[in-house]
């Protein structure tokens, strides 16, 4: 099985909250697609709550689009990581980490403005596979923690696992 890019970085050295360009590629038509690692928690030390990350999934995708989409950027998808330490965001364009971080902080401010659980988008059995597994309170606690901590940048060069280490794993 091929080694995926996300497993070639040392998770023991990742900072959180932090933005990392996980991958960048150019399509045959010349569009740049960038995948960002939006790391909310320090891997293997913290984890996002099940209900909190699910609620963030519903809120974060819309709020990030409001703050980041523009003439040169269009978000394709924002999805939670299986390890529950953050989200991957795929987009057309190549915004800087600082622009993404600013949009992320603004989106977290928006999460805090959601007044009641019933304001969570797509919170029904028709549009959500586990519509009862949500917590606005937990999502807002996550948002408060991100805002209080600020957002750093993780760089692949600083986190890259050597070929020797990868062969030994």
UniProtKB/Swiss-Prot annotation:
Under the heading PANTHER family, the entry gives: S-RIBOSYLHOMOCYSTEINE LYASE (PTHR35799:SF1)
Which EC numbers does the record give? 4.4.1.21
Q: Which InterPro entries match?
A: LuxS_sf, Metalloenz_LuxS/M16, S-ribosylhomocysteinase
Q: Which reaction does it catalyse?
A: S-(5-deoxy-D-ribos-5-yl)-L-homocysteine = (S)-4,5-dihydroxypentane-2,3-dione + L-homocysteine
The protein's name: S-ribosylhomocysteine lyase
Subunit comment: Homodimer.
> HAMAP family from the entry?
LuxS
Q: What is the free-text note on the cofactor?
A: Binds 1 Fe cation per subunit.
Q: Name one GO biological process term.
A: quorum sensing
Q: Does the keyword Iron apply?
A: yes
Q: Which family does it belong to?
A: Belongs to the LuxS family.
Q: Gene encoding this chain?
A: luxS
Q: What does this protein do?
A: Involved in the synthesis of autoinducer 2 (AI-2) which is secreted by bacteria and is used to communicate both the cell density and the metabolic potential of the environment. The regulation of gene expression in response to changes in cell density is called quorum sensing. Catalyzes the transformation of S-ribosylhomocysteine (RHC) to homocysteine (HC) and 4,5-dihydroxy-2,3-pentadione (DPD).
Q: Tell me which species this is from.
A: Shewanella halifaxensis (strain HAW-EB4)
Q: Which cofactor does it need?
A: Fe cation
Q: Which Gene3D superfamilies match?
A: S-ribosylhomocysteinase (LuxS)
Q: Which GO terms describe its molecular function?
A: iron ion binding; S-ribosylhomocysteine lyase activity
Membrane-spanning ranges: none
Query: Binding residues for Fe cation, per the UniProt record?
Result: 54, 58, 128
**What does the UniProt keyword field contain?**
Autoinducer synthesis, Iron, Lyase, Metal-binding, Quorum sensing
């Amino acid at each position: 099985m091929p080694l995926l890019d996300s497993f070639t970085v040392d998770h023991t050295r990742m900072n959180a909250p932090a933005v990392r360009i996980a991958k960048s590629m150019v399509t045959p038509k010349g569009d740049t697609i960038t995948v960002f690692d939006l790391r909310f928690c320090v891997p293997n030390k913290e984890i996002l709550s099940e209900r909190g990350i699910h609620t963030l999934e519903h809120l974060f995708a819309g709020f990030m689009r409001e703050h980041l989409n523009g003439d040169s950027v269009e978000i394709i998808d924002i999805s939670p990581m299986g390890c529950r330490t953050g989200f991957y965001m795929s987009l057309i364009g190549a915004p800087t980490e600082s622009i993404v971080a600013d949009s992320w902080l603004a989106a977290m401010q928006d999460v805090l403005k959601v007044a009641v659980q019933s304001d969570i988008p797509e919170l029904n059995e028709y549009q959500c596979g586990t519509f009862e597994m949500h917590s606005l309170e937990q999502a807002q606690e996550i948002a408060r923690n991100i805002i209080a901590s600020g957002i750093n940048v993780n760089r692949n060069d600083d986190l890259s696992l050597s070929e020797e280490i990868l062969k030994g794993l």
